[in-house]
Every structure is written in C-alpha cells, then in structure tokens.
C-alpha cells in the first residue's frame, strides 16, 4: 500500500519527490493484484479461525503477528485499488528503486515496471514473499545504497 501511495504522490506532486522507493509492488500497480475483498474481510473478522480464504489468512496472521492496526489496513485496502496507467508511470521522472520479492505472487514484476520509467531500477529480493520482502536485510542495504547514490540536495 505504501508503494501505491508513494507513486501517487510522485504523480500528483512531482516537484516534491527527489527520489522514489517502491517496495513490495511492481507491475501489479498497473494490472492489479487480485481480489482484495476477502483480505479486507479477514483483517476485520472478529475471530481469525473463521477466515477461510488462504491469502486472507496469510494477511491476517501477519497483521496479528506485527500487532498492526487491522481496521486501518482494511480501510487502506478498500480505498487503494485504483490502478495507475503505463503512461502515468512513464511520467515519473524521479530516480526510482523498485523492490519485489522473488517469491511474491502479489506484487507483479518489478523489472517490468522499471522498464516503463525513464530513471528506474528493479531489485529482486531473493527468496522473499510479499510479507517478508520489505523487511529483508538485502533490500534495506539496497535502499541505503540507492539513497547514497541519489542524495537529496
């Protein structure tokens, strides 16, 4: 959700975005990432044992494990489904780093998204799924190196 928000910011106020980092969302920003209604329902279910949707169970378990605000996450899911067009993505001129886990079946291709942008690079977060990719040490190291290479002046 943060990657979608960051991309929207870069499109709406490009003059305010010196560098852009999109973690956990690739081409899915353009072609969608599936049906999120069962995930929102899983996050707001009173009893996690009643959740039957496999992806919903995964998101619910992760939210509970990290003690996240499940209602806030569900609200974000319900309001952040707007897709961004290829033309819009191509208009993002800020240096951009895109990170997607190699086991992420939600995000879509980081490489494919980066190829649309004039100054973007993709980073494969090896062995990580959607839930674990942005917390990965290799991703964090890549982000720090990217920011060092693209200092905000």
Question: Which residues does each predicted region cover?
Answer:
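Flexible "cap/lid" loop of the alpha/beta hydrolase fold
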Residues: 4-47
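Hydrophobic, aromatic-rich cap/lid helix
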Residues: 60-85
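Short, conserved loop/helix-junction motifs that constitute active-site signature segments
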Residues: 89-93, 115-117
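Short beta-strand/loop motif that positions the catalytic acidic residue
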Residues: 92, 98-100
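Acidic beta-to-alpha connecting loop that harbors the catalytic carboxylate
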Residues: 101-104, 127-129
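Conserved alpha/beta-hydrolase "acid-adjacent" motif
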Residues: 104-110
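Catalytic active-site module of serine/aspartate enzymes centered on a nucleophile-bearing elbow/loop
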Residues: 123-153
């Amino acid at each position: 959700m943060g990657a979608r928000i960051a991309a929207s910011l870069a499109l709406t106020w490009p003059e305010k975005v010196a560098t852009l980092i999109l973690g956990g969302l690739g081409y899915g920003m353009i072609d969608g990432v599936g049906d999120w209604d069962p995930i929102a329902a899983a996050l707001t279910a009173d009893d996690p044992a009643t959740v039957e949707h496999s992806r919903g169970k995964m998101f619910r378990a992760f939210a509970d494990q990290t003690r996240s605000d499940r209602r806030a996450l569900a609200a974000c899911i319900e309001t952040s489904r707007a897709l961004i067009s290829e033309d819009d993505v191509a208009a993002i001129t800020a240096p951009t780093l895109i990170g997607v886990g190699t086991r992420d079946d939600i995000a879509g291709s980081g490489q494919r998204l980066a190829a649309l942008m004039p100054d973007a690079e993709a980073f494969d977060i090896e062995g990580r799924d959607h839930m674990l990719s942005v917390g990965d040490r290799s991703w964090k190291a890549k982000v720090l190196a990217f920011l060092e290479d693209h200092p905000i002046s």
